[in-house]
Amino acid sequence: IQGSKYIDLRLECMKQLEKIGYNGFIIANGDALLTNPRELVEVVTSLKKESKKSSYFIFSFAELSFMPILTYMGIDGFLADSANYYSHLNVLQTPTKAYDLNTYPIYDDITQKELEEKNIENMEFTIKEIHAHMKNNSLRNLVEERSGTTPQNISTLKILDKTQMDYLLEYTKLF
């Protein structure tokens, strides 16, 4: 769903696609949204509120530490290609942090392919962790735990709690 920072364009794009039978949507510019917590919250919650119940949303290029809060907000899936994307940037994705290996040389002589495999493995773990917390009705706990990993993550949670409490009560289990 394109539209940049213009939420009304994203909503119109989604509604027109729903009219012609689409129900799966990839939110464009995911990596840019992660750096702007207010816009991230506005885009995701607006799309979820205005979509049909049968629609699902996929977030592109999500950092692993953001996956719990994105799921909590209503994102239904993530692109596995983000592991490849971040490996080309020489970034190791872990459940709590994204490490630029040029700055943090955690692994010596790791190839891009090996880095992609590690990123996929960590993504699979993060998804399993999210599923386990969902089954145990403790996703909010995981969200709060991960919110401390980056300033953008904690800002996203604070903005979500402050501006979208009605949305959270309607669409999520708080604990």
What are these regions (language model features)?
Residues 1-114:
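Glycine-rich phosphate/ribose-binding loops and adjacent secondary-structure elements
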